[in-house]
Amino acid sequence: MKKVLLVNGPNLNRLGVREVNVYGKGTLETLETDMKQEAEKLGVGLECFQSNHEGALIDTIHEADGIYEGIILNPGAFTHYSYAIRDAIASISIPVIEVHISNIHQRESFRHESVTAAVCAGQIVGFGFYGYKLALFALLEKLGEA
């Protein structure tokens, strides 16, 4: 069975209470449960990780190489300035799909740039929690499983 890692970065543990007008009322637990169910329907194992700490995200990305077939990553605010996470993504051999709940290109100007997108297989933004499912579908297509 193929295995995929879902990684959520800083403040995503606050989903459902943080800026619900931007991110919706769904919680991280709901998102992870829904994604595990979707992956199971597709015959894929999915494990989840969330951290507010850059180093923990980097370590998790490094450790995923060779264990998982790919990563779905929402780097949160690190998207816009973490060259360390960008380098971690570039250093692994498995594809990474970057996902954002909101459309980062319609928000504050500092959110318009993603330093991580250029080293990802693709980027999905603005579709709420459904964007994570789109990322899973895209990742499986990239892996030749769809």
Swiss-Prot record:
The EC code for this enzyme is 4.2.1.10
Looking at its record, which EC class is this enzyme?
lyase
- Marked site, Transition state stabilizer, at 18
Q: Which residues bind substrate?
A: 74, 80, 87, 101-102, 111
UniProt-listed Pfam families: DHquinase_II
Q: Does the keyword Amino-acid biosynthesis apply?
A: yes
Catalyzed reaction equations:
3-dehydroquinate = 3-dehydroshikimate + H2O
Q: Where is the active site?
A: 23, 100
PROSITE patterns the record matches: DEHYDROQUINASE_II
Question: Which pathway does it operate in?
Answer: Metabolic intermediate biosynthesis; chorismate biosynthesis; chorismate from D-erythrose 4-phosphate and phosphoenolpyruvate: step 3/7
Which GO molecular function entries does the Swiss-Prot or TrEMBL record give?
A: 3-dehydroquinate dehydratase activity
This protein's source sits in the domain of life called Bacteria
- GO BP terms, alphabetized: amino acid biosynthetic process; aromatic amino acid family biosynthetic process; chorismate biosynthetic process; quinate catabolic process
Which UniProt keywords are listed? Amino-acid biosynthesis, Aromatic amino acid biosynthesis, Lyase
- What does the UniProt function comment say about this protein? Catalyzes a trans-dehydration via an enolate intermediate.
**Family to which the UniProt record says this protein belongs:** Belongs to the type-II 3-dehydroquinase family.
Give the PANTHER family listed for this entry. CATABOLIC 3-DEHYDROQUINASE
What is annotated about its quaternary structure and interactions?
Answer: Homododecamer.
> What's the protein name?
3-dehydroquinate dehydratase
